[in-house]
Amino acid sequence: MRIIGVIGGSQCTPHQAELAREVGRRLAEQGVVLVCGGGGGVMEAACQGALEAGGTTLGILPGSDRAAANRHVRLAIPTGLGEARNVVIVLTAQALIAVGGEGGTLSEIGMALRHGKRVIALESWELHRPDGTPPSGLVVAQNPEQAVRLALEGEPAAGTN
């Protein structure tokens, strides 16, 4: 079973929501389980797209209330871990697609790269080492179709555990 994470802000622009919805739809069409933080914004839009295409959505919730998941999450996992639940999302996913996002998304990207997970940035953070090179495992996509293709291809990036 392939599981891909979709990460991004709990609040997002209409454009980011549309990108996330399209990512979710395309993941579902590939038979992929979508894992996310289960909240609003990018997470909700991605789950909506996945459900519209008949997919499975898994929300790793920060709190202990299953009912806090957005209405498009079909499998809600309350953790009571707060933002620390981000590491559960990262470790559950085989790769992650970041759409937009703020500091929480940036922390997920860093954790994913640290654990050797491929991260696809779709109008999200673009990171560079001090020498100007991108970190291994971070790839920029131009559109949802490319983001999903990149997330599904190849082996996970080499990490530094």
List the predicted regions and their residue ranges.
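General beta-strand structural signal in soluble alpha/beta enzymes
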Residues: 35-37, 59-60, 99, 140
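Short, hydrophobic beta-strand segments that form beta-sheet elements in well-ordered domains
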Residues: 56-61, 119-123
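Glycine-rich oxoanion-binding loops at beta->alpha junctions
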Residues: 60-96
